[in-house]
Amino acid sequence: MRPATLALALAALAGCQSIPSDAPRATARLEPTRNNKASGTVNFYQIGSKVRVVANVSGLTPNREHGFHVHEAGDCSSGDGMSTKGHFNPLAKPHAHYSSSDRHAGDMPALKADASGNAKLEIDLDVITVTPGPTSVVGRGLIVHADPDDYKTQPTGNAGARLACAVIGRG
């Protein structure tokens, strides 16, 4: 094997940190809001100071990005997802791109639906936790939006209607 190929393979493996079996975790089962079809499962795993978010969502608009956020209230009773209130923001930060250190705790990457309307996402985030504390996502709402997040419009990113809703539970 050529040294450059070996180096690339080793770098790729180094980035694949496995999830410890005893890692604190939470889970959310997304259900469609009124007149929508989106549904799926999202798992949250505490790995050190970061949380790995693993999402599998179906029933989305094909070949489109969909805003994806943790919301303040763990309440999907309204039928349209509005009962989850605004983005989870315990540190009183502005809405921003998920890679910014100055953002809502609930700001996450957009879900990118494939040609069949399915989206998968796996990312490590450093602002939220699964363990108890002010930035814990447990008991919060989780929303998939109809439109992409522009990562700048305050306070929501102009992500549109709420297609699916879940309450994040310890899991």
Language model regions located:
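N-terminal leader/targeting pre-sequences
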Residues: 16-65, 70-171
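Bacterial N-terminal signal peptides that target proteins for export
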Residues: 1-6
